[in-house]
């Protein structure tokens, strides 16, 4: 394990997800015993609150927290970073149309993409958690032409984890018994959680469940709309679970997915499974040494095909919308 601190940037660091994420990062959930240097970006009005969060980080006396830098200037914060977790995004407010949301976030992720392109470390990897995550990642990637496209990913690990949890609850299996879960498409209500290639204790998950109606009518909508259900229950969006999934995704990306298993990541499509090239869409991937590879050769039946196509059509619509706005 290297003793050189890994420089990790977090945007929206004073927000709800940031508050859950920073203490996990500082305590070693991502890097274990390797030192970490946190670079925290916020908008100017939130810097005071962020100072309070840093006071709390100091008060934890984390042994592997090598340093914390905060600021509102992306180029300063991103300078030399090895990992950028783009959590901050403009939430959808009352009366906002989808185009308004894409436009507001487009400005944020255009600027951040350009800053990363200019000053990030040569080995940088960029994970986008802020929604709409897939299209925000596409905007950042397009504005960072010198960074390899494979270094950008959007978070669908939260959906992946939600799907595993629902399947475990249904079957009585432990979450550790469930392998090869896949989320296809967009991190939105059109996403497709696919149990037909998943395994529970080595057996096909759909066969173990043995209830196609439950898969279609309960499982898929529960996973796809889980975020809305959490807002309804707690009055604000899922933050701790999103932070946890952000760590899971980054850890597997940097250190590799488990043998005989795969994970879900939204990455740039090479045309696999009929997903239009260049879209940032969720796929089953294996990871090793900081690189990912789309799992090939999975049979896609008509039911799955229709679900994947519906979600990728939404992604194509979003790409068209941000093109019209001049963001890519």
UniProtKB/Swiss-Prot annotation:
Keywords assigned by UniProt, alphabetized: NAD, Oxidoreductase, Tricarboxylic acid cycle
Active-site residues per Swiss-Prot or TrEMBL entry: 187
GO molecular function: L-malate dehydrogenase (NAD+) activity
Catalytic activity from the UniProt record: (S)-malate + NAD(+) = oxaloacetate + NADH + H(+)
Hydrolase listed as a keyword: no
SUPFAM superfamilies noted in UniProt: LDH C-terminal domain-like, NAD(P)-binding Rossmann-fold domains
Keyword Iron-sulfur among record annotations: no
Binding-site residues, NAD(+): 12-18, 105, 112, 129-131
Biological-process GO terms, alphabetical: malate metabolic process; tricarboxylic acid cycle
InterPro entries found in the cross-reference section: L-lactate/malate_DH, Lactate/malate_DH_C, Lactate/malate_DH_N, Lactate_DH/Glyco_Ohase_4_C, Malate_DH_AS, Malate_DH_type2, NAD(P)-bd_dom_sf
Superkingdom classification of source: Bacteria
EC number(s) on file: 1.1.1.37
HAMAP family assigned: Malate_dehydrog_2
Biological role stated in the UniProt entry: Catalyzes the reversible oxidation of malate to oxaloacetate.
Family stated for the protein in its record: Belongs to the LDH/MDH superfamily. MDH type 2 family.
Annotated protein name in UniProt: Malate dehydrogenase
Name of the coding gene: mdh
